[in-house]
Regions:
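Electropositive polyanion-binding surfaces
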Residues: 10, 91, 239, 244, ...
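A generic structural signal for residues embedded in beta-strands
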Residues: 177, 245, 695, 748-750
Length: 818
């Protein structure tokens, strides 16, 4: 329970004094801080007290205090390896100051890293047999806790939490647990939750139901308990609706959890409500606040050179965009000129969003909150209002647009000799698509005549892109060219085709050019030690590489997990997988072994790209880190002084952007599942060729040749009793020894597909099983899903959105395996 700040006490006293007035038998309230407002619930009574609305001050003093606090906490953790009294700690740290020491100890205790025993002795939690971590509920009575561990160390095994040992924790909460000295009969360490350190979230989605005169919300995920709702807190929701409920009381031995309906998401059991629930769960909102829309609509839709400032005029240059057929926001354009010394001037021209979205404006605050645009079939939830993203910021053809240009000198072999950056004004000569450029490069006569003015440039660009790619691979970059399913929808939003997204020459061309710009800007900022937001990718976990090495060994590969920096060994695997269908699972397994890329305020390099310097610069319309990179680069070019506030802003932007990217990925993945399930409903009862894509104790995941993935439950696997071999990630027959592991081919029958949960069920085709539209099994959750790696890094590091050919109608996803 958090301590009430002193300035809130008058309000708490006021609430407490309400009890005799209302006649309520017991005082119980929840407290929530949001945008400078204290939200407190006194049973069904809501009160608001505005404390302040101004932003907290940030500056050098705060930065120094933060660093000092971190240093003090580190010293305390070193001292408290053995139990100490407060007097002993003060003797060890005589200059710490009484208040600073108390605050540091309180922070460590609140975070679960330090504990105090009954004798008032402090020590690290591990000394008392305790550990802090994340509570991972299951759809049964038991759970697990993933313990915290220092960066760079091997991940410890999850701790098993038996029934009735949850301590009131909910899925995703941070908890402190007491670890048992003995292991259970499955060899797992057990633990008991002794304290909830922090709650994961305040809102859930589910169906509103009524039993008698009482109302409840049954959460979409069975990992959460049922929540009681007072009849006065239903809002406009009706029984049977899908709703978002905020938790006002998490429940205890006497009371069940209680909540308040916040949003009615539509009729439960419909795909529309399911999509709305996914968006809400991930904090993705389609509607912009009025003040944001007003600011966006007030921006002129034509370039005003009078207010554009001093700029490099590139309007006479051959500059054009290349995007997908259905793209609406064009945030990057390219150009290429031959220089007198035989080198090329490669131009990457990015929409100058920072000219229109200024710091601390409503537009900026909303862009920071959203962090990124979210894409799903036939729809986009933009980071910026369409007046900007599809209007004045979009590099539309044959109109003047403000840009931020990266002009790089490269030779025919892809060596970069230098780069210059400038605010510019451009006029795109053509809106090209990937399909058109691919056909031009393939020799399409009609298109080559129509776009004769850029054919030679496009061909030279393609040759340069090949040279850049070759140099990138030679330095050790990993080319994880893993097919990604593409869902095509009709004009009504109904899925009509699922297929793998194609990557032609033009897609690769744009990717290479965007990578060059991103690296050039990162190098410029990092070498000058200037603050910005970088895109970083750490070395993989050796334990995960050991698992990958065991899978690669039967194919003749010898992987040394202790040398992750030697990416040549992984490149050998990737080359072999391209030429052997039996090995095509290996790139996916390698991807799952890698760390997830993230944003940071420090330049530590990008492992997958083998780049010493890297950030995101090329998509400011749809990514907030790119917008920050633009602002910081412009400040550097103008020679302005950077402050501690800039450093703080970059750190906050990096953390927020990483979190919002993860939310966007979750959103896109879960909504794609709904569309795929909707599409597959027409094929229930049919058989398909498939391949095992993941193995868990409850069954095997299989993927069809169009990318659709579903589950075969263990009890439906016929011919033997199958047991899970966790070490080798395999399902093994007890009597026959038959093994199902990742990559095993199967013939499967589709049993069920739900467009409200996204779950798809298969069975082995040789089994005689009834076919139904629904199976009574729990919904598959993130912790149960076969991992798919860092989807965002596969799709976004190039700076491009989604593209692809238009759908050609419904196609069954079967074809003979070659």
């Amino acid at each position: 329970m958090m301590r009430c700040p002193r300035q809130f006490m008058p309000f708490v006293t006021f609430c407490t004094n309400l009890r005799p007035v209302t006649g309520l038998p017991r005082f119980r309230f929840s407290i929530r801080w949001e945008n400078g407002i204290i939200m407190m619930k006194y049973d069904s009574l809501f009160l608001q007290w505005i404390i302040f609305r101004q932003k907290p001050k940030i500056g050098g003093a705060n930065m120094k205090n933060k660093e000092a606090d971190t240093e003090l906490e580190s010293r305390l953790l070193e001292i408290l390896v053995h139990p100490c009294r407060i007097e002993d700690i003060r003797r060890e740290l005589p200059n710490a100051g009484k208040n600073n020491l108390k605050n540091a100890l309180d922070a460590l205790i609140a975070d679960g890293r330090v504990m105090k025993n009954k004798k008032n002795r402090f020590a690290v939690s591990a000394h008392y047999g305790c550990a802090a971590g994340t509570y991972l509920a299951t759809e049964r009575a038991f759970a697990f806790v993933a313990p915290d561990y220092p960066e760079g160390e091997a991940k410890p095994d999850d701790l098993f939490i038996p029934p009735n040992a949850s301590g009131g924790a909910w899925h995703g909460d941070r908890v402190l647990v007491k670890v048992s000295e003995r292991k259970n009969n499955r060899g797992r360490k057990e633990a008991t939750v002794i304290r909830v350190l922090g709650r994961a979230g305040k809102e859930l989605t589910g169906e509103l139901v009524q039993r008698g005169k009482a109302f409840f919300v049954q959460p979409t995920s069975k990992k959460y308990p049922e929540i009681a709702v007072d009849k006065h807190d239903l809002g406009e929701a009706a029984v049977g609706d899908c709703v978002a409920v905020s938790i006002s009381h998490y429940g205890d031995e006497q009371f069940m959890p209680q909540g308040v309906v916040r949003v009615d998401l539509g009729e439960s059991g419909t795909m529309e409500a399911a999509i709305a629930a996914v968006l809400h769960e991930n904090g993705v909102y389609d509607v912009f606040p009025n003040e944001v829309l007003e600011q966006a609509l007030a921006i002129p839709q034509e370039v005003d050179m009078g207010t554009a400032g001093k700029r490099l005029d590139l309007r006479d240059k051959l500059i054009f965009t290349i995007d997908g057929d259905d793209a609406k926001d064009f945030d990057d354009a390219v150009s290429l000129e031959k220089l007198e010394n035989g080198h090329y001037l490669l131009g990457v021209h990015i929409a100058d969003v920072s000219h229109y979205v200024t710091p601390d404006s409503p537009l900026d605050a909303e862009a920071f909150r959203r962090g990124t645009s979210v894409y799903f079939p036939g729809h986009v939830v933009p980071m910026l209002p369409f007046a900007l993203s599809n209007g004045i910021c979009s590099l539309n053809p044959k109109v003047d647009r403000l840009a931020f240009s990266a002009l790089m000198e490269v030779d025919k072999d892809g060596r970069r000799y230098g780069a210059k950056f400038a605010k510019s004004v451009i006029c795109s000569k053509a809106r090209m698509t990937y399909n058109k450029v691919n056909k031009i490069l393939a020799g399409d006569k009609g298109l080559r005549e129509e776009y004769a003015f850029l054919v030679e440039t496009a061909e030279t660009m393609n040759n340069l892109a090949h040279a850049l790619y070759k140099r990138r691979i030679e330095r050790g970059a990993l080319e994880l060219d893993i097919p990604e399913a593409e869902i095509r929808v009709d004009e009504n939003g109904k899925p009509v085709e699922i297929r793998f997204r194609e990557r032609g020459e033009s897609e690769k061309l744009i990717e290479e050019f965007m990578l060059q710009a991103n690296e050039a800007v990162a190098e410029y900022m990092c070498k000058r030690e200037l603050p910005t937001v970088y895109r970083v990718h750490e070395n993989p976990d050796p334990d995960k590489l050991r698992v990958f090495a065991s899978f690669a060994r039967p194919f003749g590969y010898r992987i040394d997990p202790s040398k992750p920096e030697d990416t040549a060994q992984f490149q050998t695997v990737l080359r072999g997988a391209k030429n052997d269908p039996k090995q095509r699972v290996l790139p996916t397994l390698l991807l799952r072994s890698l760390a997830r890329a993230r944003y940071a305020d420090e330049c530590i390099g990008h492992y997958g790209l083998k780049a010493k310097f890297y950030l995101h610069f090329t998509s400011p319309i749809r990514r907030y880190p790119d917008l920050v990179a633009h602002r910081m680069l412009q400040k550097a070019l103008l020679g302005e002084e950077f402050t501690a506030a800039d450093e703080t802003m970059c750190e906050e932007a990096a953390d927020q952007s990483t979190n919002r990217e993860q939310a966007a990925d979750n959103c896109e993945r879960d909504i794609d599942k709904l569309y795929i399930a909707s599409y597959m409903q027409q094929f229930i009862g049919e058989e398909f060729d498939a391949e095992v894509s993941g193995v868990q104790s409850f069954g095997v995941f299989v993927a069809l040749e169009n990318g659709c993935e579903g589950l075969i439950r263990a009890e439906l696997m016929t011919g033997d009793f199958y047991q899970y071999d966790e070490e080798h990630m395999a399902m093994v027959g007890r009597h026959t020894g038959k093994r199902f592991t990742i990559g095993t081919p199967m013939r499967v029958k589709l049993l069920a597909a739900s467009d409200t949960t996204g779950q798809i069920d298969f069975a082995p085709a040789d089994g005689s099983l009834p076919v139904s539209e629904k199976l009574d099994r729990p919904r598959r959750e993130d912790t149960d899903r076969a991992p798919r790696g860092n989807r965002a890094e596969r799709r976004r590091h190039s700076g491009k959105g989604r593209g692809g050919k238009p759908g050609k109608g419904k196609k069954p996803p079967t074809r003979k395996r070659r």
